[in-house]
Amino acid sequence: MRKLFRYLKGYELQALLAPLFKMLEACFELFVPLVVASIIDTGIKNADSVFIWQRCGLLVLLAVIGMACSLTAQYFSARAALGFGTALRRDLFRHIDTLSYSELDGIGTPTLVTRMTSDINQVQSGLNLTLRLLMRCPFIVLGALIMAFTISPRLTLLFLLATAAISLIVWCIMRATLPVYHAAQNSLDRVTLLTRENYVGARVVRAFARQTQELDAFVQTNDRLKAIQWKAGRISALMNPLTYLVVNLTVIALLLSGGREVYTGTLTQGEVIALINYMSQILINLLRIADLVISVTRALASGVRVSEILNTPTTMADPAAAGLEPVAGSPAAAFDHVTFTYRGAGGPSLTDVSFAARPGETVGVIGGTGSGKTTLVDLVARFYDAGSGAVRLFGHDIRDYSFAQLRRMIGIVPQQAVLFTGTIRDNMQWAAPNATDDEIWAALEIAQAADFVRGKPGMLDAEVETAGRNFSGGQRQRLTIARALVPQPQILILDDSASALDFATDAALRAALKEKTRGMTVFLVSQRAASVQRADHILVLDDGQLVGDAPHADLLRDCPVYREICLSQFSREEVAKTL
């Protein structure tokens, strides 16, 4: 948690000036009861209107100066807190971007969103209050006690007892609420998760008529969050009644004891009023300390959660090495007895997989659901590191490549087509910011997307809405394929990225890829046998094991798993025609 304070770098002056101006304001506030006492004991007692007006003018002056100091302090504290939050948010985003898929899978997207938004906002708010109140409130409490002592040392004992009682109440309540606030933030993660799942999967929920069940699950989770927050609220609600009870009892004791001392001439009426005002100042500032502690408690809990992410080391360090040159005659991609297990999984997703893909080859990857197809190409792209064995690209261990060089070498089209807000040109230039229109149109032609892009108003400047929702599923897939083709990578991975295309468009896409990407190694992942049958060789996966690695005809003859896949999609006569 202490490491977070480094994000105040550059705002040290503001962080110093904010509490100093608040303490200056507090000094003026401590003089107010003495001025009021002088008005009562001198001005009112002697019916001296001039004196009264002078002292009232002094009160106004103290108020104006105090307000100016307060506004200045708030300006500095807000600037420091905003700078802190901005720097922390930037570094957290940058750190999350370095985490491997393994860490991201373990943490979860909803948790990361909550850390980035709600938790950082809590820390920022807590810092803002701390800069303004951490020194001011204790200073006023201590100052009020000293000022009261100068008026009546005996009655100051009542102040000390009241202050101790209120402090004990605040401490007990804070101790009880700290774990509750932490539990509330964890419960908020769950609410965020359910909300995201239902918004992203809204069509699936409706297709299976699961609205009622999902609503019930959300209501239960939301009610659990409400119950935790209600518990924290009930505990916190005890603070004001208990503290005001202590203060009111103290004021009664002050009036009784002070009245006797006024009667005996030990104290004046103005001094009794000053003591009561100092008691009020102590109460107000102890309550502010309580609010500060609540805010700091939440901020600390949130800060710990943010620190957990910042302290999560990536298991995939970037070697940041100089560009590696291909080893002559080496495969574009090769697996050497690779085994991989996802974090928390009961067994490996890939087991002892070995193969080689030569430069310029089209490699089909096929298998049933859960057979490990996506896992295999994720290892080629180094989204994960192999648990054992080695993955090599162009003769070098994949871990020796810098991420920058690796991303230039590999173009990836994921299963879920993702487009970003902007224009078609903006999306096409993601991997190649300096790509020309001719290069973009060439990629669109290969991806079978040029015709519908030309039909859009503005063509390459046509707007892309959030998540590409103004395009059909097939159009989104073709645009993401084109985006991967624009930088002309050495290796292209198509991870079941033509599932929304009709057979004619799919066939045209495969033909264009084979004709116009010569020299490019293409991994074509699909559950359609028709999509991979013309590949140079096909990797057949079954429950994480490589059970076939050969051209289509050889696999039909020698691989029962591949033959079963083909016969499940075509008749025997149709299969025979493919030979």
Predicted regions and their residues:
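Alpha-helical segments in transporter systems
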Residues: F5, L13-L34, R55, L59, ...
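Transmembrane helix-loop-helix hairpins at lipid-water interfaces of multipass membrane proteins
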Residues: K9, A15-T72, F76, F149-R154, ...
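Transmembrane helices of ABC transporter permease
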Residues: G10, Q14-C27, N128-A183, L256-L267, ...
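An intracellular "coupling" helix at the cytosolic face of ABC transporter transmembrane type-1 domains
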Residues: G10-L13, T98-S102, S118-L127, L131, ...
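Helix-loop-helix
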Residues: A47-F51, M147-L161, K231-R305, I309-L310
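Helix-loop junctions and hydrophobic alpha-helical segments within the transmembrane domains
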Residues: L92, I96, V205, V306, ...
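Conserved catalytic Walker-motif region of ABC-type ATPase nucleotide-binding domains
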Residues: I96, F218, V306, F335-H337
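ABC-type nucleotide-binding domain
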Residues: P326-L579
